Design a protein with these regions (language model features):
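A conserved regulatory-domain signal marking ACT and ACT-like small-molecule sensing domains
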Residues: 1-132
Length: 132
């Protein structure tokens, strides 16, 4: 069964350039912060980052030293079985309630679970529905 919880995600945008991901991850590493999930992409020469970490305060401070201004956003983290159809079950619960999914990113591995991060039009309601 999927388990959902509210998280505070850090996000920021910067002009894209070679080596930016390495700089960001080195800065976070220097603060001894673990990155739990990460989505990064380029659009129109800008780099967009969304990440969840084990210490937002430490990560924000480390990134500020690099001149990066971050913002915190509420997101839904969902841990689910790494099996065929699990994401469909979760997304159907959200859709059936009329909740819009603004974006999703996730990770799977060879283990028994995967994690997806959602931003929805009603995170609180989505968490309740997923945890039923």
């Amino acid at each position: 069964m999927a388990k959902a919880k509210k998280l505070k995600q850090l996000s920021f945008t910067m002009p894209n350039r070679a080596g930016l991901l390495s700089e960001v991850t080195a800065g976070v590493l220097g603060a001894k912060v673990n990155i739990n999930t990460l989505c990064a992409y380029e659009l129109e020469n800008n780099a967009y980052f969304m990440l969840t970490v084990d210490s937002n305060a430490k990560a924000k401070k480390a990134l500020a030293k690099l001149g990066i201004e971050t913002k915190e956003e509420d997101v839904v983290a969902v841990e689910m079985s790494n099996r065929v159809g699990e994401l469909e079950k979760v997304s159907k619960k959200i859709a059936d309630a009329g909740i819009n999914i603004n974006y999703i990113y996730g990770t799977t591995g060879t283990g028994k679970s995967s994690i997806c991060v959602f931003k929805t039009s009603d995170n609180t309601k989505a968490i309740i529905l997923i945890n039923k």
